[in-house]
Structure formats: C-alpha cells, structure tokens
C-alpha cells in the first residue's frame, strides 16, 4: 500500500453538513414571470393536467357528448351563474355527470379562497371513486378554474405553489389574475407553516 492510500485510511473523511434552505415563498412578480415565461403547453378546450383531473373552458363544459366520451364523471363550474357559464345540475340532467357550481367573478378583488378547501375536498372525493374523472372549468379555463386546480394540488397533493403551477403548465397554459395569485400565496404560506416547511 503506498503512502497516499495509508494517509487516506488514517484521515477520516469529513463530509460537510447538507444545508437545506427553508422554503422561500415566491413573490407575486416571480409568480407572474413564471406564468408568462414557461408557456409551452397548447391551449385547447380541455386538457388533463393531473391524473383524471381536467382543466377546461365553457365550450368543453357545454359539450356533454365529448365529456362522456372522455369519461368525465364530475364537473366543477367555477363560473356558474345566469350571466356567466350557465350550466348546472339541470343542464347535465339525463347524463352520468355530477355537478358542483361556484359563482365566481374573474376579478382580482373576488375572494375565491373561501372555496379552496370545500372544492378541493369535492375533487379529492370524486377522484377517490374508481374510474372517476373530474373537469374543472370556467369561461376560458385559465384563471378561476386554474386557481381551484392549483389549490387542490397544494392542499391534497402537498405541492408548493410553484410546483403546482409547473405541474399544470406542463399540460395547459394558465394565467390566474393577480388577486387569485395573492390568495394562493396566502394558502402556500399557511400550508408550509402547518407542515413545518416554512
């Protein structure tokens, strides 16, 4: 054995402690940059953004035949109401589709956060039924419905806000308004605190 190998045997190998940096919540500007810079997905009427979870627009929601063909079993309308996307349980009568509606405005001052947990639970419960598929939609499928899908991924799939955005954007371009992004930031911070990652 040469002297170099002997020295290596005698000298203990010191490995530096791995530094795990705490989670840094994203700023509104960095989220908006992420939403605009990473645009790669094509925008169609309906896209599967997570296993058995679809994000779409009003056109997709009104095409009952296509929904049935895709195996959609549950529809979440985040633009419900007479002057928005006026579907509803009555619209889907005679089909196997279950309906959940939220009357939400695509307005930065609208508090969509009050719906995060109830709708996320509805989506989770629906996805736990074998062979279920869920469509979450609004008028364009980029702001209100995208915000709800992001909240679901954060709450029940344990994703950070950035991870959730990147996951969805790999399949569909989205652009939640600034008020919804702020509400998602609050959710992100709360979830990170509750899990001890902040």
From Swiss-Prot:
Name of the gene: Dusp13b
Cross-referenced SUPFAM superfamilies: (Phosphotyrosine protein) phosphatases II
Reactions the enzyme catalyzes: O-phospho-L-tyrosyl-[protein] + H2O = L-tyrosyl-[protein] + phosphate; O-phospho-L-seryl-[protein] + H2O = L-seryl-[protein] + phosphate; O-phospho-L-threonyl-[protein] + H2O = L-threonyl-[protein] + phosphate
Catalytic class of the enzyme: hydrolase
PROSITE patterns (alphabetical): TYR_PHOSPHATASE_1, TYR_PHOSPHATASE_2, TYR_PHOSPHATASE_DUAL
Swiss-Prot/TrEMBL keywords: Hydrolase, Protein phosphatase
UniProt-listed InterPro entries: Atypical_DUSP_subfamA, Dual-sp_phosphatase_cat-dom, Prot-tyrosine_phosphatase-like, Tyr_Pase_AS, Tyr_Pase_dom, TYR_PHOSPHATASE_DUAL_dom
Domain Tyrosine-protein phosphatase: 45-193
Natural source organism: Mus musculus
Record flagged with keyword Hydrolase: yes
Biological classification of the source: Eukaryota, Metazoa, Chordata, Craniata, Vertebrata
Protein name, entry field: Dual specificity protein phosphatase 13B
Active site positions, chain numbering: 138
Entry function: Dual specificity phosphatase that dephosphorylates MAPK8/JNK and MAPK14/p38, but not MAPK1/ERK2, in vitro. Exhibits intrinsic phosphatase activity towards both phospho-seryl/threonyl and -tyrosyl residues, with similar specific activities in vitro.
Keyword Transit peptide applies: no
């Amino acid at each position: 054995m040469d002297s170099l190998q002997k020295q290596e045997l005698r000298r203990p190998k010191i490995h530096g402690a791995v530094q795990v940096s705490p989670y840094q919540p994203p700023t509104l500007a960095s989220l908006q940059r992420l939403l605009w810079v990473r645009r790669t997905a094509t925008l169609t009427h309906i896209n599967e953004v997570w296993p058995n979870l679809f994000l779409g627009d009003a056109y997709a929601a009104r095409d009952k035949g296509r929904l049935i063909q895709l195996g959609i079993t549950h529809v979440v309308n985040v633009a419900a109401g007479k002057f928005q996307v006026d579907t509803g349980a009555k619209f889907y009568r005679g089909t196997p589709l279950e309906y959940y509606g939220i009357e939400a405005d695509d307005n930065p001052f609208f508090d969509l956060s009050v719906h995060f947990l109830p709708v996320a639970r509805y989506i989770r419960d629906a996805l736990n039924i074998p062979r279920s598929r869920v469509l979450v939609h609004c008028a364009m499928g980029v702001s209100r419905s995208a915000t709800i899908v992001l909240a679901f991924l954060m709450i029940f799939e344990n994703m950070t806000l950035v991870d959730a955005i990147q996951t969805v954007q790999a399949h569909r371009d989205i652009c939640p308004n600034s008020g919804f992004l702020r509400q998602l930031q609050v959710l992100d911070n709360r979830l990170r605190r509750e899990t001890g990652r902040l």
